[in-house]
């Protein structure tokens, strides 16, 4: 096996009002009563109950946001949530410790690694790249060219779903579909959720 491929999309929080700096794209697309059908079979993760930068929040506010977000999503989807995506990439040792104490197995930051390494710390899970960055396509092509070695590789791409409505460069649904088509159906890649990629790494590392 060459490696694992995993993807993360963030959607606009239902019922949360923001003064978004890019009002020319629609953020609230899927009604709450349709989300279970739309996201059936997908892994669900928290992102802050009110999109708070948890690393900059007071301890009580941080804990309340994590607890409320986790409880709401678990009630809606009827599943246990074990993953988190830091809003604005904001985190801290206290935030990470609290997430682990609440049963979280991983949490993603936004700063790209530009490579294919598994995370040393799943609570500080760095993606390979954002899908809308100019280097995303080149990174995917480099991943496909890599020869299997002693260590498995991880291609981890993320984006906000509304960014695909920008219709500029990589930030379009057309570009996204072409990229996924270019990497789909390969026997040397395991396509998995964020949670599964973390579990695979921990198992191989004997942790």
Regions found by a protein language model. Name each.
Residues 68, 72-76, 142-146, 182:
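A generic secondary-structure signal
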Residues 123-131:
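Gly/Pro-rich active-site loop or hairpin
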Residues 1-95, 114-124, 153-164:
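Metal-dependent polysaccharide deacetylase catalytic core of the NodB/CE4 family, i.e.
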Residues 97-104:
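Short, surface-exposed basic-aromatic patches at helix termini and helix-loop junctions that form
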């Amino acid at each position: 096996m060459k490696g694992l491929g995993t993807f993360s999309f963030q959607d606009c929080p239902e019922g949360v009002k923001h003064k978004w700096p890019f009002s020319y794209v629609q953020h609230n697309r899927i009604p709450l009563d349709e989300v279970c059908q739309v996201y059936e079979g997908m892994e669900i993760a928290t992102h802050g109950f009110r999109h708070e930068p948890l690393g900059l929040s007071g301890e009580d506010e941080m804990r309340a946001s994590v607890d409320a977000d986790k409880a709401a999503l678990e009630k809606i989807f009827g599943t246990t949530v074990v993953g988190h995506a830091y809003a604005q990439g904001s985190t801290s040792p206290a935030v990470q410790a609290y997430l682990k104490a609440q049963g979280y197995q991983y949490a993603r930051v936004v700063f790209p690694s530009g490579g294919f390494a598994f995370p040393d710390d799943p609570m500080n899970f760095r993606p390979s790249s954002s899908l809308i960055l100019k280097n995303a396509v080149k990174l995917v092509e480099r991943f496909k060219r890599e020869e299997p070695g002693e260590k498995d590789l991880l291609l981890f791409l993320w984006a906000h779903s509304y960014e695909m409505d920008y219709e500029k460069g990589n930030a379009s649904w057309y570009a996204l579909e072409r990229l996924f088509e270019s990497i789909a159906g390969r026997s040397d890649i395991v396509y998995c959720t964020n949670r599964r990629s973390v579990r695979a790494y921990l198992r191989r590392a004997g942790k």
